[in-house]
A protein has these predicted regions:
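S-adenosyl-L-methionine
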Residues: 1-4, 226-243
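Core catalytic lobe of class I
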Residues: 1-224
């Protein structure tokens, strides 16, 4: 689906992970554009998404803490500031601890104060809303007591997704959108991912009985998302048959 085909004030929750501007090798997108142009692009899509959500609509935005390659940039701070500037209201930030410090390959100046790199193995999930935080309607929640207690802790500990296994340069695990969806939306709510990628958000929508909408400009990634959704549906049917 094209984003212009989505009706305004119709989305309950947006969960997405946009291009990071850190030189990830996407097929149809240059992820190494000048940083000021990247921020202009960010402002444009954030404003468009603001018009799509309901007055009590929410946004869960997965972004990096910073950018070291090609010059240090405070990506999290800059994008959060832009989101507020275009009209989003800030609620909180969740720290996603990917626990992948062992995959580090660069330290800058090794064992020297000359120019060391400090790299945190975390990403950020910025939680924002349009006009009011409290939901206008009372829906059905499907979050358990244990999930609620764990997920309202602002540090989430789980691993990332294997890009080779999934076939996408920057997939996020289904666990990430699933947590956001169950914590910040009701059953049957409409969830949008404007950067669908490999389809993790729509798989999470299937798991949680939400109505999912995905937007993706790359045909190959669209086909990958459809393939994963079909495989998930087949797996679910097999589980039902076994049970």
């Amino acid at each position: 689906m094209k984003i212009d085909a989505i009706e305004g004030d119709s989305i309950d929750l947006i969960v997405t992970s946009p291009p990071y501007g850190v030189d990830i090798k996407y097929e149809n997108y240059n992820d190494n554009i000048p940083y000021d142009r990247y921020l202009d692009f960010t402002a444009e899509w954030l404003k468009k998404c603001l018009n799509l959500v309901k007055p009590d609509g929410r946004l869960c935005l997965n972004i990096p803490l910073d950018k070291l390659k090609g010059g240090g940039q405070s990506v999290y701070v800059d994008i959060t500031s832009i989101a507020k500037k275009v009209g989003w209201k800030y609620h909180t930030t969740i720290i996603w601890n990917e626990q992948n410090i062992s995959r580090r390959t660069a330290w800058g100046s090794w064992l020297s104060a000359s120019a060391p790199f400090v790299i945190a193995p975390v990403e950020m999930i910025v939680v924002m809303y349009k006009k009011q935080w409290k939901k206008k309607h009372k829906g059905t929640s499907d979050i358990s007591r244990e999930e609620f207690l764990e997920w309202t802790n602002g540090v989430w500990n789980f691993g990332g997704e294997n890009r080779t296994k999934i076939g996408h340069p920057a997939p996020f695990p289904v666990e990430l959108p699933k947590r956001c969806i169950k914590l910040f939306s009701f059953v049957e709510d409409v969830v949008l991912d404007p950067f669908l990628g490999s389809g993790s958000t729509l798989i999470a929508c299937l798991e949680t009985n939400r109505k999912g909408i995905g937007v993706e400009i790359n045909k190959n990634y669209c086909e990958l998302a459809v393939k994963r959704l079909k495989e998930y549906g087949i797996l679910q049917r097999k589980l039902v048959e076994v049970l």
